[in-house]
């Protein structure tokens, strides 16, 4: 069974990035076991490899980090659960199939949200997990951006629990103009982060083990 490790308190993004990179090296070089890090970051905008500078609108005093993950700009901050699975897709019980891996990530998050009564969707040509907020109008509740090195995954998923959604106003999230963002709180679901963590671990084990 894959170990889940919760990093306490707000964590600097670059510190976590180094932690991930170091652990990926251990998985590749000395066959360390797979792990999933659960993190809550200090405020930061991160840019993936497909970012466009004009998608950074107004970030005031929030730092901007240019990362190696896929995707474009997103926001991380308090009240958001960020999940970093470090999995070895080359291991016998996995598959060297990135599309399948992303599909499994999506299914995992959708099932976890469903536990709390939130019906979530995938939208063609729009990365991430979405919920319907009005008739024919959707808002993103979770962002996905991954990277793989020698078939070992890192980076991952960010889910808005009680996030200050106004912070997304400093960017064009994931490069999608006029897209809405939402959170569990905004949808009327008020839970502790620890309660959410229990469910995502349960749902992870149903799909990845």
Curated annotation (Swiss-Prot):
Active-site positions on this chain: 174 (acyl-thioester intermediate)
Cited Pfam families: LplA-B_cat
BP GO annotations: protein modification process
E.C. number(s) listed in UniProt: 2.3.1.181
List of residues binding substrate: 69-76, 143-145, 156-158
Single GO cellular component term: cytoplasm
Reactions catalysed: octanoyl-[ACP] + L-lysyl-[protein] = N(6)-octanoyl-L-lysyl-[protein] + holo-[ACP] + H(+)
Keywords carried by this UniProt record: Acyltransferase, Cytoplasm, Transferase
InterPro entries: aa-tRNA-synth_II/BPL/LPL, BPL_LPL_catalytic, Octanoyltransferase, Octanoyltransferase_CS
Sequence similarity: Belongs to the LipB family.
Additional remarks: In the reaction, the free carboxyl group of octanoic acid is attached via an amide linkage to the epsilon-amino group of a specific lysine residue of lipoyl domains of lipoate-dependent enzymes.
Name listed for the protein in its UniProt record: Octanoyltransferase
Species annotation: Rickettsia canadensis (strain McKiel)
Organism lineage: Bacteria, Pseudomonadati, Pseudomonadota, Alphaproteobacteria, Rickettsiales
């Amino acid at each position: 069974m894959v170990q889940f490790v919760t990093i306490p308190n707000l964590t600097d993004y670059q510190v976590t990035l180094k932690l991930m990179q170091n652990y990926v090296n251990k998985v590749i070089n000395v066959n360390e076991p797979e792990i999933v890090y659960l993190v809550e970051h200090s405020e930061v905008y991160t840019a993936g490899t497909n970012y466009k500078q004009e998608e950074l609108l107004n970030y005031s005093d929030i730092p901007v980090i240019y990362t190696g993950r896929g995707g474009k700009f997103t926001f991380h901050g308090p009240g958001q659960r960020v999940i970093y699975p470090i999995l070895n897709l080359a291991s016998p019980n996995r598959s060297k199939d990135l599309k399948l891996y992303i599909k499994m990530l999506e299914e995992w998050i959708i099932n976890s949200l469903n536990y709390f009564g939130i019906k979530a969707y995938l939208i063609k040509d729009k990365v991430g997990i979405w919920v319907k907020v009005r008739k024919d109008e959707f808002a993103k509740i979770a962002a996905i951006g991954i990277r793989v090195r020698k078939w070992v995954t890192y980076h991952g998923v960010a889910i808005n629990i009680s996030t200050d959604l106004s912070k997304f106003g400093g960017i064009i999230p994931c490069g999608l103009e006029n897209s809405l963002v939402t959170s569990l709180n905004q949808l009327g679901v008020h839970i502790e982060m620890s309660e959410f963590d229990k469910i995502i671990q349960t749902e992870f084990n149903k799909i990845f083990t």
